[in-house]
């Protein structure tokens, strides 16, 4: 197993049904990136909808945060990684080709390894 380095791992399991909660990991992950702390947001369950092209454009803004699409784009532009659960997109009939730029698919082993290697893990 690799040595733990300073990085933060966020797991998000909701989307449009809870826009404020869906925004939180992207706000925190962008702040981490601004602090030179690498961050990854892993979308699981309904969270995978956020990686579907066109979905975020139609989401209601959550809390006092900017629109979720802007939060996602800002995070990716800072070099943040977005992982999307393969079984979750299959269950929701979302094709890999329909995922936003800057996202990549992942499965259980990679998610577990990232959690073990991260300084902190937050689940939303």
State the predicted function of each range.
Residues 5-9, 118-120:
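Polar low-complexity intrinsically disordered regions
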Residues 10-23:
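Short, glycine-rich nucleotide/cofactor-binding loops
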Residues 22-35, 41:
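Histidine-anchored nucleotide/phosphate-binding helix
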Residues 33, 76, 115-116:
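Anion (oxyanion) recognition and catalysis
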Residues 38-44, 82-86:
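Short internal beta-strands
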Residues 47-61:
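N-terminal beta-loop-helix "entrance" segment that forms/cooperates
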Residues 58-86:
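A glycine-rich helix N-cap at a beta->alpha junction
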Residues 74-75, 83, 90-92, 96-98, ...:
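A short aromatic-anchored loop/beta-hairpin motif
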């Amino acid at each position: 197993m690799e040595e733990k380095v300073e990085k933060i791992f966020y797991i998000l399991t909701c989307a449009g049904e809870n826009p404020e909660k869906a925004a939180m990991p992207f706000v925190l992950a962008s702040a981490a990136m601004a602090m030179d702390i690498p961050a990854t947001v892993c979308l699981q369950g309904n969270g995978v909808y956020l990686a579907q092209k066109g979905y975020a454009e139609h989401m209601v803004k959550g809390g006092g945060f900017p629109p979720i699409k802007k939060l996602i784009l800002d995070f990716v532009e800072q070099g943040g990684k977005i992982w999307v659960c393969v079984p979750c997109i299959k269950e929701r009939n979302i094709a890999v080709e329909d995922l936003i730029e800057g996202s990549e698919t992942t499965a259980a082993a990679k998610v577990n390894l990232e959690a073990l290697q991260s300084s902190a893990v937050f689940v939303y």
